[in-house]
Design a protein with these regions (language model features):
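Conserved beta-hairpin
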Residues: 5-20, 35-39
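Short hydrophobic/aromatic beta-strand element in the GNAT-like acyltransferase core
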Residues: 5-9, 19, 56, 61, ...
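Conserved acyl-donor/pantetheine-binding loop and adjacent beta-alpha core of acyl/acetyltransferases
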Residues: 21-61
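Conserved GNAT acetyl-CoA-binding A-motif
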Residues: 55-57, 85-97
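Conserved acetyl-CoA-binding loop-helix of GNAT-fold acetyltransferases
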Residues: 61-64, 70-83, 109
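Conserved beta-strand-loop-alpha-helix junction that forms the acyl-donor binding cleft
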Residues: 62-69, 94-104
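Conserved active-site alpha-helix within GNAT-family acetyltransferase domains
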Residues: 75, 84, 98-117
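Conserved catalytic-core motifs of GNAT/GCN5-like acyltransferases
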Residues: 95, 111-128
Length: 135
């Protein structure tokens, strides 16, 4: 993963307090949820160009240690991973479980991601969210 994709780590005094990954679809498409997501891309109707395997990558997971939340680490991680993938992809995509309200709020607010689809896998509902990698 590290050699062919992207990993950003946040450290405080040599302790890892957060991380985020992003990767090409070839790494993820072996899992059923990603196959479902990718199969839905051609049918998406949203305000941007068609999202494809070649103009987008999978973003996430992202994690920030609970005691460091609310200190700008989430935003810094998103900003840095966005900067790193921008030369390769126009969009980052992620999915968030409908019942994960904190993650949805962080991604729609702080990460400026937009809901582009809603889907169900194994009786669980998810938002598919997208963000441009460049302003």
């Amino acid at each position: 993963l590290v050699q062919h994709h992207w990993v950003v780590v946040a450290q405080v005094e040599q302790q890892i307090v957060g991380y985020v990954i992003a990767g090409r679809w070839g790494f993820f498409e072996h899992w059923p949820i990603y196959r479902t997501l990718l199969n839905r891309l051609p049918q998406l109707d949203w305000d941007g160009p068609k999202l494809t395997k070649t103009n987008s990558c999978q973003y996430g997971p992202i994690w920030v240690q609970q005691t460091y939340r609310g200190q700008g680490i989430f935003e810094a991680l998103v900003s840095e991973i966005r900067r790193q993938v921008a030369p390769h992809f126009s969009y980052m995509l992620t999915f968030i479980a409908e019942d994960n309200e904190r993650s949805f709020a962080a991604h729609s607010g702080k990460a400026h991601m937009q809901v582009v689809d809603f889907f169900t896998v194994s009786a669980r509902d998810y938002y598919l969210m997208a963000a441009k990698t460049q302003a």
